[in-house]
Amino acid sequence: MLVLMFVYIASGLLLTAVSVPLILGRIPPNGLYGFRVRKTIEHPQIWYLVNKYAGQRLLLSSLQLIVAAVLLMYIPGLSIDVYSYAVLVVWGAGATIAIVSAFRYMNSL
């Protein structure tokens, strides 16, 4: 289970690293990286605003993944199956909220 925790932590750190350039506005509109929908691709001003917002939410959900991976590891008697599902459910909820809120923000512009 320790190996799985390190995989989750590494994944969270990778997502954190991916979110920082978005937050800092360093990623121009492109077809590979960022919050890519028609509205953001067609309007560079909206691209930077929405990607900053989405990057902040991605950062929060990646930190949520790391915290869940560490804290759930120390629940006594937790099986590896329950641990893996619990971490993914916690992160999945945060990621879903991040995506929905980014769409709502984009639609408010």
Language model features with spans:
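Helix-coil boundary and interhelical linker segments in multi-pass alpha-helical membrane proteins
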Residues: M1-V7, M73-V82
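Select subsegments of transmembrane alpha-helices in polytopic membrane proteins
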Residues: N51-Q64
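Transmembrane alpha-helix/helix-exit interface in multi-pass inner-membrane proteins
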Residues: T16-N30
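Membrane-helix interfacial "entry" motifs
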Residues: M1, E42-A54, I80, S84
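C-terminal structural segments of small proteins and small subunits
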Residues: P76-L109
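Alpha-helical transmembrane segments
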Residues: V3-S19, V87-A93
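Cytosolic, membrane-interface loops and tails of multi-pass inner-membrane proteins
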Residues: P28-Y48
